[in-house]
Amino acid sequence: MFAVIYRWRVIAGREAQFEAGWRAGTERIAAEFGGWGSRLHKGEGGVFVAYAQWPDEAAWKHAMETRMRHSDDEARQKYRDAIEPGSFETLFCGPVLADLLDLKRA
């Protein structure tokens, strides 16, 4: 299992638009590139962070080579129009060494 953490700064007032684009895009990425899904977190000052899981590094790299260009153009445009230019960054990527999340409690 491979994990990636992303960070964005969203333009004030466009948070719902960003979340809608992110949500639809994440679903397409899972369907088209084999991603295992993601969790989105909202911080202060318009900062959003997502934690994504992939079956392996090769699957993630393949998706990144296409800039994760999935088939939902509307979702991609919502997402792009909501983020501050140049604010996207990959904070971390690497293999999962231990997984102690208890999803039964959620």
Model-derived features: positions:
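A short, structured loop/turn motif at beta-sheet edges
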Residues: 12-13, 46, 58
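Active-site-flanking beta-strand signature of metal-NTP-handling nucleotidyl enzymes
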Residues: 2-8, 49
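Short amphipathic
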Residues: 7, 92-97
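An amphipathic, aromatic/His-enriched active-site/gating alpha helix that lines ligand/cofactor pockets
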Residues: 24-37, 53-93, 106
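Short, surface-exposed ligand-recognition loops at beta-strand->loop->(often short) alpha-helix junctions
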Residues: 9-20
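Short, histidine-centered active-site or binding-site loop motifs used for metal coordination
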Residues: 7-10, 54
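A short beta-turn/loop motif at secondary-structure boundaries
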Residues: 40-45
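Short hydrophobic/aromatic beta-strand element in the GNAT-like acyltransferase core
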Residues: 3, 37-38
